[in-house]
A protein has these predicted regions:
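Phosphate-group recognition and catalysis centered on beta-loop-alpha active-site segments
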Residues: 1-263
Length: 263
């Protein structure tokens, strides 16, 4: 873990609000299913690294999870200090709470636990949304779960690594014609900066072609790490001036002023 430079814990409503206040267009959050079938927002595979509890999210009810301190285990010096201990009690939100807190914001929902039932519960919430709210949601996760969601909806923006790879390989073969394969419709694409120039029409035409089929292009730093972000002013200079899509960052507080000057 890095030494804290701000007072926010990930996957909490205060940290999401801070991101939006700094100018984020979309915020990413992680979902896991609780023992009582609620969608908790939490990243780690188990609770013991962040909290004082042990086990998985699915072993607890949401009421029990609300009692935990999600800042309990945060340490940047091997356990000498715990700067967030005592400050994260009750901060683990549900998806419903996030949706209520940000009723008009775009959200990127990452299903973390790989449990098919999690996708079913999530779909129950998505299908009850208005068309406008539905269009603000994007979901990514494992191959089987995302394929199942595609069966439920042809228009929900989705992403899995297999889906993305298949669609982009097709595009590499035919993109010179301007045609966008149906495999790339209604998606989110995480495109590594190092490989992006291989795509036909990159950057401007490619982004426009994807936008025309309801696909969001997210540029990530480096060579393919899923959430490698443009987290320094220097890294932002590597973004092509003509790029009009989305940029992944884990430090919008640092880079938003630089990104804003590019617009």
């Amino acid at each position: 873990m890095d030494k804290p430079e701000h007072p926010y814990l990930e996957n909490t409503i205060p940290s999401m609000r801070a991101a939006f206040d700094h100018g984020a267009d979309v915020v990413d959050l992680d979902l896991k299913l609780t023992k009582d079938q609620q969608l908790a927002v939490f990243h780690d595979a188990t609770l013991e690294y962040r909290t004082e509890a042990k086990g998985e999210i699915g072993n607890y009810t949401m009421t029990e999870l609300k009692q935990l301190d999600i800042g309990y285990g945060y340490t940047a010096d091997g356990g000498k200090t715990f700067p967030f201990r005592g400050k994260g009690v009750g901060l683990m939100p549900t998806l419903d709470e996030v949706l209520t807190a940000f009723p008009h914001k775009d959200l990127l929902l990452h299903v973390k636990d790989g449990n098919h039932q999690t996708y079913e519960v999530l779909w129950g919430k998505l299908r009850a949304m208005t068309p406008e709210r539905f269009n603000q949601m994007t979901v990514y996760g494992n191959d089987d779960g995302i394929a199942w969601l595609r069966q439920q909806s042809a228009t929900l923006r989705l992403c899995s690594k297999t889906m993305m790879k298949a669609g982009l390989l097709r595009y590499l073969a035919v993109g010179w014609t301007g045609y966008v394969p149906h495999e790339l419709h209604n998606m989110e694409l995480h495109i590594p900066r190092r490989y992006a120039p291989l795509l036909w029409g990159w950057p401007g035409k490619f982004v426009d072609r994807m936008a025309a089929v309801n696909t969001r292009v997210m540029l990530v730093e480096g060579d393919g790490q899923w959430s490698a972000g443009f987290d320094t002013e220097e890294s932002v200079t590597q973004i092509p001036p003509q790029f009009g899509g989305y940029v992944w960052t884990n430090r919008i507080d640092r880079v938003q002023p630089v990104l804003a000057r590019r617009r």
